[in-house]
A protein has these predicted regions:
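Conserved glycine-rich Rossmann-like NAD(P)H-binding loop of the short-chain dehydrogenase/reductase
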Residues: 26-42
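Catalytic Tyr-X3-Lys loop
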Residues: 79, 95-114, 131, 155, ...
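Short C-terminal tail/terminal secondary-structure segment
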Residues: 91, 218, 229-240
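Conserved mid-core segment of classical short-chain dehydrogenase/reductases
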Residues: 86-103, 144-147, 186-190
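Active-site helix of classical SDR
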Residues: 117, 151
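Active-site Tyr-X3-Lys motif and surrounding loop/helix of classical short-chain dehydrogenase/reductase
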Residues: 65, 69-72, 92-96, 100-107, ...
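Conserved glycine-rich cofactor-binding loop
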Residues: 12-13
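Alpha-helical segment proximal to the catalytic Tyr-Lys
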Residues: 122, 164-168, 226
Length: 240
């Protein structure tokens, strides 16, 4: 997989950082984005080059610019784009849900994802692939989780359309929808009892690890997944 470049949006923590590591180990040079302070990540992982860029995905000009920067710094457009950047907010029943928190979810998880996926569709190389992170919770009714899962369901709808639109260019489009994964984003606002309830949703009685999700992303980014297109893969430990 030499001389291929991946661009990971939201690549400095949790699942995103694991994706950067795994894609680099699989042979990709990896560009990644962050929001504020530059992360302390190495400039190379093994023989693969890595470089970070400050990008607010809610600003379409910044999203467009990072594709130009990656083309300049890595010798061309990316072969793979991973749309991982997003937020969560405290859950709650719809009747009492803070409208401002819902607005934030829409702004980042839907509008921001739209900017990333739209730019990816314009810039990814022919024969490349686009992967977006969503959530298995889209298919599970969980009290209090409706606003967040609605924002991720919107991303899945965009992916389904893109899979048809980009097929003439042989660009594969897929989603990865993990169940609960042990990240800072997942643990924010949860006590240990809430974490245990999430773990109990899997028959293995645990939550996933970022590296387990990154393995799926790496597979989809590889030639081994050449016949996987328009799919939502759910690494969730059997959560049904």
């Amino acid at each position: 997989m030499s001389n291929r470049t991946a661009l990971v949006f939201g690549g400095t923590r949790g699942i995103g950082a694991a994706c950067v590591q795994k894609l680099a180990e699989s042979g990709y040079d990896v560009a990644y984005t962050y929001v504020t302070s530059a992360p302390n990540l190495p400039a190379k992982i093994g023989s693969s080059k890595t470089k970070g860029y400050a990008v607010d995905i809610c600003q379409p000009a910044q999203v467009a610019q990072v594709f130009a920067d990656v083309a300049r710094d890595f010798g061309g457009a990316p072969h793979c784009v991973v749309a991982n950047a997003g937020i969560n907010v405290p859950p709650g029943p719809l009747a009492q849900f803070d409208p401002e928190n819902f607005r934030k979810l829409v702004e980042v998880n839907i509008v921001g994802a739209f900017h990333v996926l739209s730019a990816a569709a314009r810039n990814v190389r022919d024969g490349g692939n686009i992967i977006a992170l969503t959530t298995s919770m889209v298919r599970v009714a969980v009290p209090g989780g409706g606003p967040y899962t609605a924002s991720k369901a919107a991303v899945e709808s965009l992916l389904r359309s893109m899979s048809k639109e980009l097929a003439p260019r042989k660009v594969r489009v897929n989603g990865v929808a993990p169940g609960p994964v042990d990240t800072d984003l997942f643990r924010a606002g949860k006590n240990e009892e809430a974490v245990a309830r999430s773990a109990a949703m899997s028959p293995f009685n645990r939550v996933g690890q970022p590296e387990e999700v990154a393995e799926v992303v790496s597979f989809l980014a590889s030639d081994k997944a050449s016949w996987v297109h328009g799919q939502i893969i759910q690494p969730n430990g059997g959560m049904v």
